[in-house]
Every structure is written in structure tokens, then in C-alpha cells.
């Protein structure tokens, strides 16, 4: 029997034999494609090739692509685990032609692979084509020899593919496998008439032969292309003669492992089976998402990951798993697939810790949320209502972190619907509140005016890699509100665009340059430089003298010292990332950065706070590279070549086909290689020195290092020396003896504190004895009330403990005031609990002090904000006892 690895390798090897370039799977995070949350098909990494925006050094390609479909129109989440073939994560096998071969070859390749390489019987194969695609029909019948009765013509919905409203599109042809009558859904079962599993689509061949214009007209492409996709999970199930994808060697090891740790059996109870299948599916998705740099969060891709972890955890709870377990099943995925996808192995330890932490956090809120949901559903049941209100669903989402699909799952099992319309309304209101509070709302208005300039063909040429000064013509002037103007008068601020500039605009985490822009009629201070688009650089200026006019020639001079400081920090950011990966592990990925003249800030994926030893080692290694005075070199090359060379790139960052590669070190000693458009030093020695000033956590699994370089380190060290000298003077010692002196003082202080505690304990004991002299008797009950001013709550408790040890029966109410705060303790001995309990009594007497409290039957505590009400509180207690 063919294993999954056999089939994957057979597919790739088959097409390599026909001159296809094997291309590694791209990340689940689509590069340069803001329209997609995740890579959901094999063609995604080739989209720009198909649209003609990019060229590659090959015309044929084959891939096994990691894909994820959770959300949007490709949302399989609700069906996962309930059907034989729905998954969140899956692998798409594909072969592609970029203007090389077309329909005939694509069909021949597919048919030969299925019937000869996989040995699937032709009698079980059926074909669908687009209704007007006579070419495909002719190839299937006359070249391949498929009987016409096995070919079905389908409409545009089923057999015509398009990339969007415009762009490449074309008919497609699907190969279906007949799984037999046992899968039949009834009398109307058949291709195109039902959605059951009998006639299972296994391979889709897309013939990109048209371009759809904005008018809706379709014109023939000069170089038609091929895009095919075959789901690995489906073809494995067929080859292994399994009725469900979950019964194959892709899923069974995970399912059986999960069943063993949960103490349950697969294929005994349907609900248990669903839970096991969901956990197996989600474990695969979770592992690959984290391996590709996605971390749990409350938005975007991170929120999808969080949903999957929480959903799988809840299904685990249904089969008796009350402790974290997903981190174990995720490791099983690594064990199964790490040899093929090595990124799983390199991040396995990090992955386990992220998942474990997320499970622990969710388990804390899950029980509370489930109790609330259960109570709400029971209340609705009593009212004979079958819909959970949207505000309750939103509270579960907002307060307890319950995704809507989890709420729907639980509600539907109890035959309740959820008012999703009101839920979405409340969600939208929350988003609008967030938008209205966002401080950058003015920025959007400015961006709109820059967009207008771009649409008018406005461009700026950046000459700042080689030059810190230059001349350019002023091609646009905007006032501070972004409105176009003819002149910018003295003392005013605005935006200046020149046709060429040495000023670097904010991008890639690097802040914009500052400097001087002047003309024959005026002078400005450039306080910032923006880069709203690839070819547009905008100078933010304040006119210091004269007037700046549109269409003038301007002299632009970048502040050399500020640029150099920024370059120091940027180069050290590259060195830092490389060092972090060497010391902490390959799981370290950049999660954000800021490079300015004064400091660098680097966010990276790592689960635990750095130890002092790790921080010291990182600092030492970065400074070692600085002192080695390694050269920096900049090269331009195509993106694919750069990545193959080992250059690090941010998946969220937008890169062109030709990229700028910054390499630190020589051929024999490379410290770092990254895609980067920023400004850098020419050698590492120019950085001078590197000091980490802080290391903090900013999100689950994300740490932040802030550091300084160059002359900023000198200022930092000088300030430290000054503080150390001042501290030494106060302590009357030498700077090098400060630690020794402070240690001695702390030790002395500790001994003194012990003496104070002993004296205070004795004093409090005496205080207790003294208070017992003031006992009064009400209705045969010994009662003590006392206001002890300026005692801490701890001291009050110690006095109460002393009194309790000496009073066998009675009621004691002690109070203390600290400013406007009131502390209240109430004790009721056990023999009086048939009439009074401390927890009930305290609630009746705290109103005068504007307080609230509670506790146990024997002792309760309250806090208040009205010290003047204490006498009334004591009087209230006495009245209650007298009335009993």
C-alpha cells in the first residue's frame, strides 16, 4: 500500500521527469497578497507570474503546497470532523505551466499519473468540463480515449475559474473518482446533482486562456497557462482504499495517540470520533501556523490560530481532557511530518510552549464561560425561547474569549439558535468605538491626498543610498491638512514632494530622515520624511524663513549625524536578529521593529523572558561582531535567488521581483543576510558599541528588546556613572563598593525588621488584652467594638487573632482608618452561629461606612470610604443584637 509520503514523492518526481521545477511550499502567510488571510491554493505563490507582473527562470513548476481554509468563502471549519473530507489544513499537489504547454499536455499528464503511476482503474474515473469547452472534450475523447458517457458538461459556477472580477481566467476540467454505491445519497445521486462523496473530485485542471476586462469582456491571452490542484488527503484515501481521509496514515497516528491519552476508543461512539477527528485536524493546522510564524492574538491570523486552539481544547474537554493536551498532539504532527517540512522540527519546542500556555490561559476562562452559557440556556428553556440573545453571545466572546463558532456548537447541541445578527451588530459597534478613539484618524485623510498624487502620476526618485545631499524640483506642495497649495509661507508647516531626494522615507521599520530643504526664496526644517507608496517620498517641513514655491529648484541636505545614528541601529538590528537565532534557536522570527537615530526596538517570537545570562551572551556576541569590523555589501537580485541564498525576509513585508540584499560579513564569515531597503553602515565597526537597555514581553510568545548603539551608548554609560557616583556619595562609600554597601545595609535592615516585628507582636498582644477589658454584654452575648486608628489591615488581623485565642464566646467588631479608607473585621464565635454569622452580619452594618464585604460564618471583612460612619456601624451592630 502506498503511504502518504510515497504518493507525495511520486507526484513531484513524476513532474520533475517532465522538466518541471520542484518549488518548495510557500508559507501559509501569503507574500505580497493583502487579499488573502492564508495561502489557500497551490497557485497563490505564482499569482504574479500568471498575471504577468513577475517572471521566473522556469516555465514549468510542481509543488506540494501547505494550505489553510478557515474563514471567508473557503470556510470548512463547521464541517471538520463531521465529514470524511473537510479539513482546515491540507496539502495541495499541483503542476503549473507559465505560457509553455496547455490543455492537451495538462490532460495527458494528469491521466497518465492517475492511471499508470497510481494504478487507479479507468472504470471508476469520470470527467467534467466547461459546457462550451469543445477543445477539452475533444482531447478527453479522441486523445485520451475516455467514453463520451463519462464526460459531463457543467456550467460556469462549477467549471469556470477566475482570479477575481478582472484578470486571468478560464474553463477547468475535473477528474472524479466513483467510490461506489455505498456512498450514494439517493435516487438523484450523480455528478452535478448532489454533493455526496460517491463521485469524489480528486483533480482540477484549470486552463487559463482568457483575460477578463473591467467591461466584462473576455479576450484570449497571448500565452495561456495551466494551474492544477489535487488534494493530497483525498488521493491518499482513495489509494489506501479508505472511506474517510481520517482513516489514512495522515491522520490515524494522531487520532490513535489522542485516543490513548484520553482513555477512549476510536469508532465506538460518534461524538467521541468527531472530537478525535477535530483534534487531529486542528493539531496539524496549529503546528504549521506556528511554524510559519503565526502566534495567538486577538486579530487577523493570530485570532484564527487562537480559535483553533480553543476549539480543539473544548473538544478535548468533551472526551474528558481537563488539562492541556494539544501541545502533545502538535508534537505528534512534528514527528509525522517534520522530515518533509523541516520548519516543524526547527520550531517544535517553541511550538509546544506556545500551545501549552494558550491552553492553560483558556482553561481558566472556559469553565466560567461554560457556567454562564449553561445558566443562560437553562433560563431560556424555562421561558420556552429557542434563541440565545446576541448580547449574551457577545459577552461570552468579549469577556471569556469564546469564538462565535464555539458558542454556536454548544447552543446547537442543546437545540438553540444564536442571534448572530445582533452579535455582529455589537461587534461592529465595538469596532467603530475603537476607530473613533484611534489617534491616527487624521493620517487617513492625508493618505487620501497622497493617493490622488499617485493617480496623477507623481513620483520621487530616491538617491539617498549614495548621497546625503542633492537638488530636486518641487513637484507638489500641500498644507498641513493635505490640501494642494502654490506656496508655503514662513512659520507654516506642510508637505513638500520633489522629483528626486536623498531623504529616506519611513518604511521597513526605519524612521524617516530629517534635515534642511531650501530654495532661493526660503528655507525649511525637514522634521520627518514619509513614504506613502513605493515611488513617492514626502518631506514634512516647517518653513523657518522666507517662502517655498511650487516648481522651484530645491537643495536637499540630510542630517549626516542623524542618518549615521539610524544606520548604526539598523545594522545592529540585523546583527541582533542573527545572534538571537544562534543563541535562542531557529524559532526566533522578527515580529516587528523600529529603527530610529536614538534607539532600536526589536520584537521577536520567543516564549519565555530572557535570563540575565542570555542577555549578556546576546550583548557580547553582537559586540564581538561589531569589533570584528566586518564589511557590509549590498546587492540587487531577483527575490527567488535571494531567498535561495538564505536571505531572511518578512512574510508581511512587500517586496518587488528585484530585491535589495544586505549581507554583513565576507563570503567565509557571514553574520547576517537579509532583504532590506534601509540605510546601513559600510562596516560593523562603525556601530561602536551595543547595549540592551530593556527586555520585555508584549504579547503571548512575543518578546521585545530595546537597545542603543554608537554615541547613544556613551551618553547612557555617562548617565550610569553619574548615578553610581551620586549613590556612592549618599552611601559614603566608593563607586566600586556600592553593591557591597547596599548588601550590608539590607542585611542590617532585615535584622532590624525582625526586632520591630517582635516588638510589634508584643504590642499587639498587649493591645488585644487591653481591648478585652472593654467587653460589654448584650442579650447574654459578650460584645466588643473598637476603632483602632492608623492600624494596617495586617495589624488589625493580628489583633483579631489574639482576641479570638482568648475569647471562647462572643462577637468582636474591629475597625481601623487610614485616611479615607476604612477596614472592618467581624468575628462571631461558633456557638452563636445558630443566630448570627459574620458573613451575614457584616452586610447589614457596612452601609454607614459606604462599604461592602463578606466572608466565612466565623470571620468576615469589609472595606469602606466613610470613616465618619463608624460609630453608626457599631451602633447598628448593637441594635441588631439587642433586637434578637
Curated annotation (Swiss-Prot):
GO biological process, one term: negative regulation of DNA-templated transcription
GO CC aspect terms: cytosol
UniProt keyword annotations, A-Z: Aminoacyl-tRNA synthetase, ATP-binding, Cytoplasm, Ligase, Metal-binding, Nucleotide-binding, Protein biosynthesis, RNA-binding, tRNA-binding, Zinc
Cofactor remark: Binds 1 zinc ion per subunit.
Principal location class: cytoplasm
Family: Belongs to the class-II aminoacyl-tRNA synthetase family.
PANTHER family: ALANINE--TRNA LIGASE, CYTOPLASMIC, ALANYL-TRNA SYNTHETASE
Biological role: Catalyzes the attachment of alanine to tRNA(Ala) in a two-step reaction: alanine is first activated by ATP to form Ala-AMP and then transferred to the acceptor end of tRNA(Ala). Also edits incorrectly charged Ser-tRNA(Ala) and Gly-tRNA(Ala) via its editing domain.
Name of the protein this chain belongs to: Alanine--tRNA ligase
Organism: Lawsonia intracellularis (strain PHE/MN1-00)
The gene coding this protein: alaS
Amino acid at each position: 500500500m502506498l503511504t502518504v509520503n510515497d504518493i507525495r514523492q511520486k507526484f513531484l518526481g513524476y513532474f520533475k521527469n517532465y522538466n518541471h521545477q520542484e518549488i518548495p511550499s510557500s508559507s501559509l502567510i501569503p507574500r505580497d497578497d493583502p487579499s488573502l488571510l492564508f495561502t489557500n491554493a497551490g497557485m497563490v505563490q505564482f499569482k504574479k507570474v500568471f498575471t504577468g507582473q513577475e517572471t521566473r527562470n522556469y516555465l514549468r513548476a510542481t509543488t506540494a503546497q501547505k494550505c489553510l481554509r478557515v474563514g471567508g468563502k473557503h470556510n470548512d471549519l463547521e464541517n471538520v470532523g463531521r465529514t470524511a473530507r473537510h479539513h482546515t489544513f491540507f496539502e495541495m499537489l499541483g503542476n503549473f505551466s507559465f505560457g509553455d504547454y496547455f490543455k492537451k499536455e495538462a490532460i495527458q499528464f494528469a491521466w497518465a499519473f492517475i492511471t499508470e503511476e497510481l494504478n487507479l482503474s479507468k472504470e471508476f474515473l469520470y470527467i467534467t468540463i466547461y459546457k462550451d469547452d469543445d477543445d477539452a472534450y475533444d482531447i478527453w475523447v479522441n486523445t485520451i480515449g475516455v467514453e463520451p458517457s463519462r464526460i459531463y458538461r457543467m456550467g460556469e459556477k462549477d467549471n469556470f475559474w477566475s482570479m477575481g472580477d478582472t484578470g486571468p481566467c478560464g474553463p477547468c476540467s475535473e477528474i472524479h473518482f466513483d467510490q461506489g454505491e455505498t456512498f450514494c445519497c439517493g435516487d438523484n445521486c450523480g455528478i452535478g446533482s448532489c454533493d455526496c462523496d460517491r463521485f469524489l473530485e480528486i483533480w482540477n485542471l484549470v486552463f487559463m486562456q482568457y483575460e477578463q476586462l473591467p467591461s466584462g469582456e473576455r479576450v484570449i491571452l497571448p500565452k495561456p497557462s495551466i494551474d492544477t490542484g489535487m488534494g493530497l488527503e483525498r488521493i491518499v484515501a482513495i489509494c489506501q482504499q479508505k472511506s474517510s481521509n481520517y482513516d489514512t496514515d495522515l491522520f490515524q497516528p494522531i487520532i490513535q495517540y489522542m485516543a490513548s491519552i484520553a482513555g477512549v476508543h476510536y469508532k465506538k461512539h460518534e461524538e467521541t470520533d468527531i472530537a478525535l477527528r477535530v483534534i487531529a485536524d486542528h493539531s496539524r493546522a496549529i503546528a504549521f501556523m506556528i511554524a510559519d510564524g503565526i502566534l495567538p492574538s486577538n486579530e487577523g491570523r493570530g485570532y484564527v490560530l487562537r480559535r483553533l486552539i480553543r476549539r480543539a481544547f473544548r473538544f478535548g474537554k468533551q472526551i474528558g481532557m481537563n488539562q492541556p493536551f494539544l501541545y502533545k498532539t502538535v508534537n505528534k504532527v512534528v514527528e509525522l511530518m517534520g522530515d518533509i517540512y523541516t520548519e516543524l522540527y526547527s520550531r517544535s519546542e517553541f511550538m509546544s510552549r506556545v500551545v501549552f500556555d494558550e491552553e492553560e490561559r483558556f482553561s481558566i476562562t472556559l469553565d466560567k464561560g461554560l457556567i454562564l452559557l449553561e445558566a443562560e440556556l437553562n433560563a431560556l428553556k424555562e421561558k420556552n425561547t429557542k434563541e440565545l440573545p446576541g448580547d449574551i453571545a457577545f459577552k461570552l466572546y468579549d469577556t471569556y474569549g469564546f469564538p462565535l463558532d464555539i458558542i454556536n456548537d454548544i447552543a446547537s447541541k442543546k437545540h438553540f439558535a444564536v442571534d448572530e445578527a445582533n452579535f455582529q451588530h455589537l461587534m461592529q459597534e465595538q469596532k467603530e468605538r475603537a476607530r473613533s478613539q484611534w489617534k491616527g484618524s487624521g493620517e487617513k485623510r492625508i493618505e487620501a491626498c497622497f493617493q490622488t498624487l499617485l493617480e496623477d502620476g507623481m513620483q520621487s526618485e530616491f538617491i539617498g543610498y549614495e548621497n546625503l545631499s542633492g537638488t530636486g524640483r518641487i513637484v507638489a506642495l500641500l498644507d498641513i491638512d493635505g490640501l494642494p497649495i502654490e506656496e508655503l509661507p514662513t512659520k507654516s508647516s506642510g508637505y513638500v514632494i520633489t522629483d528626486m531626494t536623498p531623504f529616506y522615507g519611513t518604511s521597513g521599520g526605519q524612521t524617516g530622515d530629517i534635515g534642511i530643504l531650501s530654495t532661493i526664496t526660503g528655507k525649511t526644517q525637514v522634521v520627518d520624511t514619509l513614504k506613502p507608496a513605493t515611488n513617492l517620498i514626502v518631506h514634512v517641513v516647517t518653513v523657518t524663513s522666507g517662502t517655498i514655491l511650487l516648481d522651484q529648484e530645491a537643495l536637499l541636505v540630510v542630517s549626516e549625524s542623524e542618518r549615521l545614528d539610524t544606520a548604526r541601529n539598523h545594522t545592529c538590528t540585523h546583527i541582533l536578529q542573527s545572534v538571537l537565532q544562534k543563541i535562542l534557536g531557529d524559532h526566533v522570527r522578527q515580529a516587528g521593529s523600529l529603527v530610529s537615530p536614538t534607539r532600536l526596538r526589536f520584537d521577536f517570537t520567543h516564549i519565555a523572558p530572557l535570563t540575565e545570562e542570555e542577555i549578556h551572551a546576546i550583548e557580547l556576541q553582537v559586540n564581538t561582531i561589531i569589533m570584528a569590523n566586518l564589511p557590509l555589501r549590498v546587492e540587487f537580485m531577483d527575490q527567488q535567488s535571494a531567498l535561495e541564498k538564505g536571505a531572511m525576509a518578512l512574510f508581511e513585508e512587500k517586496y518587488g521581483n528585484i530585491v535589495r540584499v544586505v549581507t554583513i560579513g565576507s563570503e567565509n564569515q557571514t553574520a547576517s543576510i537579509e532583504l532590506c531597503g534601509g540605510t546601513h553602515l559600510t562596516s560593523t565597526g562603525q556601530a561602536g558599541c551595543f547595549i540592551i537597555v530593556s527586555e520585555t514581553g508584549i504579547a503571548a510568545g512575543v518578546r521585545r528588546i530595546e537597545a542603543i548603539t554608537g554615541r547613544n551608548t556613551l551618553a547612557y554609560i555617562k548617565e550610569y556613572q553619574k548615578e553610581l557616583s551620586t549613590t556612592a556619595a549618599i552611601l559614603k562609600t566608593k563607586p566600586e563598593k556600592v553593591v557591597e554597601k547596599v548588601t550590608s545595609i539590607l542585611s542590617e535592615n532585615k535584622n532590624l525588621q525582625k526586632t520591630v516585628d517582635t516588638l510589634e507582636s508584643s504590642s499587639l498582644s498587649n493591645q488585644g488584652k487591653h481591648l478585652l477589658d472593654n467587653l460589654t454584654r448584650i442579650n447574654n452575648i459578650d460584645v466588643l467594638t473598637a476603632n483602632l486608628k492608623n492600624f494596617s489591615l495586617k495589624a488589625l488581623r493580628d489583633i483579631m487573632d489574639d482576641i479570638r485565642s482568648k475569647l471562647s464566646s462572643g462577637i468582636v467588631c474591629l475597625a481601623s482608618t487610614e485616611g479615607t479608607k476604612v477596614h472592618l473585621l467581624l468575628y462571631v464565635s461558633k456557638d452563636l452561629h445558630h443566630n448570627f454569622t459574620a458573613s451575614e452580619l457584616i452586610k447589614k452594618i457596612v452601609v454607614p461606612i459606604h462599604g461592602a464585604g463578606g466572608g466565612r460564618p466565623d470571620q468576615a471583612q469589609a472595606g469602606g470610604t466613610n470613616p465618619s460612619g463608624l460609630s453608626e456601624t457599631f451602633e447598628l451592630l448593637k441594635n441588631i443584637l439587642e433586637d434578637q
